[in-house]
Amino acid sequence: MTDWSRGSWTREPAAVALDAEGSLVVEAVEGSDWWRDTAYGFRHEDGHGLLAPWAPGAAVEVTFALEGFTGEFDQAGLVIVVDDATWIKAGVEQSDGHPQLGAVVTVGASDWSTGRVDDWTGRAVTVRASRIADAVVIRARSRPLDADAAASGEGDDWRLVRVARFPHEDARIGPMLCGPTRAGFRVRFLDWRETAPDGELHAPPPA
């Protein structure tokens, strides 16, 4: 069972509870988000991140249920924080009427890369971060929420989401959610784990 207590919140959510299966159900505060300057001209530094130190020799995976993403910019995944001006968030965000898999890399100012994943709705989504040399590699995949199907190994191959320069040894990482435009957005986090790092960029992660 996942030890959710090993992390601390960057901002306390509206509500946090463990369900019968040991998943962490979290409700975002309305208006919570992370973004710095680019295009929109504002700064939001009050998203919800459950963070622990990131060991340099480990990859980190966060899994959540992609359900109930109905508000514009509802989002969940993982976040890596060095400081207020240096961070990466990656996961699924509801934007322009579609769930979008993407990443925001912030070094002073934010950028955003994204693409639709409508077929992932109602599935478990895993977002993975691993260091390779001076970079962080973000990957993601989905699998059925049904426990029997998940146990059978059914699921998507890993998708490469982002390769970003990341020379930092000291960072914190963990599950993330934000509800920029509405109250009541809840995310069911299924797992948060450390695992073996990627061996190379153009090969699947270790099983």
Predicted regions and their residues:
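Extracellular glycan-recognition regions
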Residues: 1-207
